[in-house]
């Protein structure tokens, strides 16, 4: 595959858009009184498909952390009153993570804000994907490199 300038422009636009969203998301988490990592943890717990809750290994996988780093994050979140640990009902040696009421409320508030922001970003992201598929560099620059309006 021979790379051309637009390949780099597309990759830059995609990474810039992702970084801007992540930066915004981190700011939202801090404004809610939690760290960005705690926000990701809360989302990993509530978004986990098993109603029993994720294991520490599941959390490590979702957050791309080593097991001991996930343990530390869970410890800090538990100390902050965001999550609890409990044994798995089928296997007492397995630890499951659950949200507290406080953790659930913070995540619900952040998720509402994030979904609203994603609705605003959706048109630009659709344009970006179309540009990536069609190699439309001008559309790509307009869609991804122009800051999104800040509602409110």
Residue positions per predicted region:
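Short, structured helix-loop boundary elements
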Residues: 7, 11, 35, 56, ...
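Histidine kinase transmitter module recognition
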Residues: 17, 21, 48, 62, ...
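Short, hydrophobic-biased segments on the C-terminal half of alpha helices
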Residues: 56, 74-75
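Pre-recognition alpha-helix immediately N-terminal to the DNA-recognition helix
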Residues: 13, 20, 40-44, 105
């Amino acid at each position: 595959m021979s790379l051309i300038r637009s390949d780099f422009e597309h990759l830059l636009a995609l990474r810039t858009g992702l970084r801007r969203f992540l930066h915004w998301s981190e700011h939202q988490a801090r404004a809610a009184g939690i760290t960005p990592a705690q926000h990701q943890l809360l989302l990993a717990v509530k978004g986990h498909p098993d109603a029993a809750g994720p294991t520490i290994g599941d959390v490590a996988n979702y957050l791309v952390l080593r097991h001991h780093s996930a343990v530390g994050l869970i410890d800090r979140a538990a100390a902050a009153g965001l999550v609890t640990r409990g044994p798995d009902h089928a296997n007492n040696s397995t630890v499951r993570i659950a949200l507290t009421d406080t953790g659930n409320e913070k995540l619900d508030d952040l998720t509402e804000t994030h979904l609203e922001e994603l609705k605003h970003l959706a048109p630009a992201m659709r344009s970006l994907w179309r540009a990536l598929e069609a190699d439309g560099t001008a559309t790509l620059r307009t869609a991804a490199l122009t800051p999104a309006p800040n509602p409110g």
